[in-house]
Amino acid sequence: MAASPYSIFAVQLLLLASWMLSSSSSNFNQDFNIAWGGGRARILNNGELVTLSLDKASGSGFRSKNLYLFGKIDMQLKLVPGNSAGTVTTYYLSSEGSVRDEIDFEFLGNLTGEPYTLHTNVYSHGKGEREQQFRLWFDPAADFHTYSILWNSKTIVFYVDQTPVREFKNMESIGVPYLRQPMRLFSSIWNADEWATRGGLIKTDWTQAPFTTSYRNFRADNACVWAAKASSCGLAAGGNAWLSVELDAKSRGRLRWVRRNQMIYDYCVDGKRFPRGVPPECKLNLHI
């Protein structure tokens, strides 16, 4: 039986309300749920700040109430100061189900005075193994910095303080699945001392616990909320130019600078890991 005009209108109102909610000023009470960790995850300052903590018993995490299908998402993070070795702070988009799409920022802790490793990965249709790692050009525990994901039908770009550090293009034309599932935003802190710092050689020093990461200024102004099997971007008048944005010449130059000066691992040049040849997308990504 065909849906009535009234039910269609109700769905449209729901989507418009979701879009307006996501475009308003950040409020963690409004936008997120604590996912795990109990009192280790705290929403403070009337919803303006979140802290996630890790102790020997457990880590903690939160997730967005909304699902997104394409978007530009920003969050400011201040990472664990001092001896953060063995800890991992995550900030990522992920779909539901076993054949997942995922866009990962992970911050691997280190000894006091040693740099964090920014670990990135992309899963498309359940396939990952696309790790790239970087050293940041600042201390991410000294102050808040902005980490952003641009995801549209043409490309995915990882940004740090508006500087692009990684791009994953739509390469369906050569048989590489692209990310097209609705995703939530997640963040967490947890213990990974079996691998996180120097391949697991440095273990977590629990005398330094609790380890705490802070979050503020979440923005999803340019993000398509997915609800009732429809996208809010079909209702928003204008403001969706980012849906077709790609890196311009200036941004591509900044990306090349990051790759030359800050990248410490790239799966696309790991011949030992891929003795039969690197994945097909690498042939395009090497020429940026």
Curated annotation (Swiss-Prot):
GO cellular component, one term: apoplast
Induction: In fruits, expression increases by propylene or abscisic acid (ABA) treatment, and is highest on day 4 and 8 of storage, respectively. Expression decreases by 1-methylcyclopropene (1-MCP) or gibberellic acid (GA3) treatment during storage.
Post-translational modification: Contains at least one intrachain disulfide bond essential for its enzymatic activity.
Active site per database record: 102, 106
Domain GH16, residue spans: 26-215
Tissue expression remark: Highly expressed in mature fruits. Very low expression in leaves, flowers, calyces and stems.
Catalyzed chemical reaction(s): breaks a beta-(1->4) bond in the backbone of a xyloglucan and transfers the xyloglucanyl segment on to O-4 of the non-reducing terminal glucose residue of an acceptor, which can be a xyloglucan or an oligosaccharide of xyloglucan
Signal peptide residue numbers: 1-25
Protein name from the UniProt record: Xyloglucan endotransglucosylase protein 8
Organism this protein belongs to: Diospyros kaki (Kaki persimmon)
Chain's gene name: XTH8
